[in-house]
Amino acid sequence: METRESVYAGVIADKDIVLVAGTNSPESAMAAFAVGAKRRVQDCALGKAVLAFQPPRVIDEVERSFSAAATEGSDPEALRAELELIRSRGYAIHLDEKRGTECEIAVPVIFAGETVEAAIGISGPSSRLTPDAIPALAEHILATAEKISRQLS
């Protein structure tokens, strides 16, 4: 399956996800973030896909940073519920709440069969990454992440 969407890979660094690789969709007019760019883990699908599989102490640290920063959209209870959903279905979704036009889907990459420090994912307009399309796209990304995980084991 070819998605023709932007593809990214990121690694966790403290409370951020750092983009380490990516390619932009030939069909997207949206601005992409560049390799080396950082986003808070709770603000993107790549970050949530990694955070969901971190030890409780790491999640607690992210929640404490909510209180310190008092940032918009930083609800610890909602985050915990979302992380539980990510663990159960295997992938994260992030909708751009500010613009409402972009959707991201990401899955964790498992290192040596046990730790999650990275994720891969796609992003594109919500007109193409619709609720009906997301499960099939997520399955494709999950299969790709499993191949990467096997190569890293």
Located regions from the model:
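Intrinsically disordered, low-complexity terminal regulatory regions
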Residues: M1-N24, A136, H140-L152
